[in-house]
Amino acid sequence: MNEEYDVIVLGTGLTECILSGIMSVNGKKVLHMDRNPYYGGESASITPLEDLYKRFKIPGAPPASMGRGRDWNVDLIPKFLMANGQLVKMLLFTEVTRYLDFKVTEGSFVYKGGKIYKVPSTEAEALASSLMGLFEKRRFRKFLVYVANFDENDPRTFEGIDPKKTSMREVYKKFDLGQDVIDFTGHALALYRTDDYLDQPCCETINRIKLYSESLARYGKSPYLYPLYGLGELPQGFARLSAIYGGTYMLNKPIEEIIMQNGKVIGVKSEGEIARCKQLICDPSYVKDRVEKVGQVIRVICILSHPIKNTNDANSCQIIIPQNQVNRKSDIYVCMISSAHNVAAQGKYIAIASTTVETKEPEKEIRPALELLEPIEQKFVSISDLLVPKDLGTESQIFISRTYDATTHFETTCDDIKDIYKRMMGSEFDFEEMKRKKNDIYGEE
């Protein structure tokens, strides 16, 4: 371990593993350590089930009705992948896809007036949907056609809207869309957690709706993918990539000290040995004095013996509860998967509800989601701090990832990865460029 590295990475969460893989592909010498004996950090999948009970300090062993403990892989953080999103692109460009199998999630649902409705995934479904009335549907369709044709680099597609200036509120007004449709569009399609976006320039929202539509177009049932055996497979896939390109991995390594000189990181001390480095990437748990808390997320993992009511017995789905349906500022999400994904015993379902904490009683806040899941066989409640780095790391060369937010997809995580990459390398992260570098350094496949 007493060696020189270009980059040392602490923690094997998804952000850290992807960056470690990318740095190795870029020809950098990487050492990757984690104090835990397992991969994934905050974004791990826990197996066997007994370990989940221990982690949440639930007394006794899981009952026999839960099946074999090792049939379970329970994600601590619930997220899906957008089929056409940034994470899938990263998986494809790095060829990490060869280590993973994905299934399309069976449906996306939205909560309205105490009931859940399927988010239409075809024009026929949209016409038949009871989410909106007939005239509303026509206006909504016109809006979707506009979005599909929109190209921020081609002013001919703007139709009088300035993507950098016109607010989304004005765009909705132009198409004469009602409040219900606005809620649905902003929260179930553009996947915003709050309504702050309404007064921002519309370009970002239109592109988010395009991402949803393009992801949906890929597989037809829903825009979401989920890996067999759980999300813990993702960091492991990128860790393999890093190892193939010469990265060194060490799990179960207690980190004693991050060594600084003149305000800059020069190495990491573990078990009495020092590994030297020029740059350090880590999650907030390794540098508690360099991060600040900006909020909290509550997540409740629920084990069920039945599919969720009114979802056509889907073996996987997402439910979005828009904030103003339950008088909140931020949406509540439910991600549900099952034995079909090799993450639960036969006939069992895992539903994870999550939201941004807004009051002193987070468990009360998440109740509307739990009511949709009853009866619940066992629940595991966690409240996590949302931590962000206090500075950009340019002085110290310590680059800290953000904790995982309450969104149900990885787009914000990928934004963080690209942001850290840019700060470390001084250039934008470019998929094509990465592919070329890989071929230059390691030859064509």
Curated annotation (Swiss-Prot):
Pfam families: GDI. One of its GO terms (biological process) is negative regulation of protein localization to cilium. Ubiquitously expressed. It is found in: Cytoplasm; Membrane; Golgi apparatus, trans-Golgi network. Signal peptide: none annotated. The keyword Cytoplasm applies. The modification Phosphoserine is found at residues 130, 382. The modification N6-acetyllysine is found at residues 112, 269. One of its GO terms (molecular function) is Rab GDP-dissociation inhibitor activity. Keywords: Acetylation, Cytoplasm, Golgi apparatus, GTPase activation, Membrane, Phosphoprotein. It is a peripheral membrane protein. The modification N-acetylmethionine is found at residue 1. The modification N6-succinyllysine is found at residue 57. One of its GO terms (cellular component) is cytosol. The keyword Acetylation applies. Belongs to the Rab GDI family. GDP-dissociation inhibitor preventing the GDP to GTP exchange of most Rab proteins. By keeping these small GTPases in their inactive GDP-bound form regulates intracellular membrane trafficking. Negatively regulates protein transport to the cilium and ciliogenesis through the inhibition of RAB8A. Interacts with RHOH. Interacts with the GDP-bound inactive forms of RAB3A, RAB3B, RAB3C, RAB5A, RAB5B, RAB5C, RAB8A, RAB8B, RAB10, RAB12, RAB35, and RAB43; binds RAB3D to a lesser extent. Interacts with DZIP1; this interaction negatively regulates the interaction of GDI2 with GDP-bound RAB8A. This is Rab GDP dissociation inhibitor beta. The gene is GDI2.
